[in-house]
Amino acid sequence: GVADDKSIYPYVPDMIRFYLGEDPLLHNVPTWQCRKPKELAHVLAHLPELVVKETQGSGGYGMLVGPAASREEIELFRERLKARPEAYIAQPTLSLSTCPTFVESGVAPRHIDLRPFVLSAPDRVRLVPGGLTRVALREGSLVVNSSQGGGTKDTWVVEE
């Protein structure tokens, strides 16, 4: 859907203000839209530091994690960006939290991210007390998508 299109991401704070009439409680991750020439220039100059994602992509496919990429991979991605800048966004590489995770070798720390859920009714909007925590099961990986070998954990809020 439209909300899954990564090119919408920079506009989410404005959408919150428009639809909910309030300021966002959390800030967005800085996002450069490669379709904008000045932003593309910034991305090309900082490729080894950034995560670059296809705007229409899903599941962790078609992305570059600059700090983990080889020089060859970075140069290949540079050419892709120049050929189709409108198809990509870029973000800084985030330092994800870790949590103890049961893996083949035992319990070990793995990177995680949280997907909260919001329920909307005609008279109110409600944040679900919990969410889905996505886990990068490969040691050192920042890619939490299940299609790329990631896993999931239920997350519950036990006290407010």
Segments predicted by a language model, with ranges:
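Domain-scale recognition of functional cores that engage charged ligands
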Residues: 1-160
